[in-house]
């Protein structure tokens, strides 16, 4: 393929452990043509190290979302819980149900992993506006180019 996309909340980079993620990263590298591009939008592990645990709320168009972000430092794993309240409905005491564990990666880790697979990062961003990535931004968007074809 000329391009492989991995947008937020997708399966790539959102699995519980390194082994399963590395299988998917390898499939990405093998699927790309020489000179192909891979765009990845994932949560930033470096941000999680310094900002989690935390609780956030987001007022959307139709409702309010309460989120809890827990962090297992030794495993570099996010445990995420969420409760949604629709506007106009009765409010009840939230019971956060623990979601699936998600292994998060830093920019350095992703650069090293994909480098071993023949891809190099050419740009990294904090969001879709083109803002440069940093450890103080929750999202990490990376654009990778293939250097070699992995067989």
Outline where the language-model segments fall.
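A short acidic, Gly/Pro-enriched loop at the edge of an enzyme's catalytic core
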Residues: 1-4
């Amino acid at each position: 393929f000329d391009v492989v996309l991995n947008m937020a909340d997708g399966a790539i980079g959102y699995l519980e452990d390194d082994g399963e993620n590395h299988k998917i990263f390898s499939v990405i590298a093998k699927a790309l043509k020489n000179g192909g591009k891979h765009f990845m939008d994932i949560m930033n592990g470096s941000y999680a190290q310094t900002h989690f645990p935390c609780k956030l709320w987001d007022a959307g168009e139709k409702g309010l979302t309460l989120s809890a972000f827990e962090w297992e430092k030794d495993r570099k794993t996010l445990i995420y819980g969420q409760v949604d309240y629709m506007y106009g409905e009765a409010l009840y005491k939230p019971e956060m149900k623990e979601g699936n564990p998600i292994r998060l990666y830093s920019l350095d880790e992703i650069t090293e992993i994909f480098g071993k697979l023949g891809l190099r990062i050419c740009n990294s961003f904090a969001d879709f506006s083109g803002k440069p990535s940093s450890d103080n931004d929750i999202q990490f968007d990376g654009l990778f180019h293939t250097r070699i074809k992995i067989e």
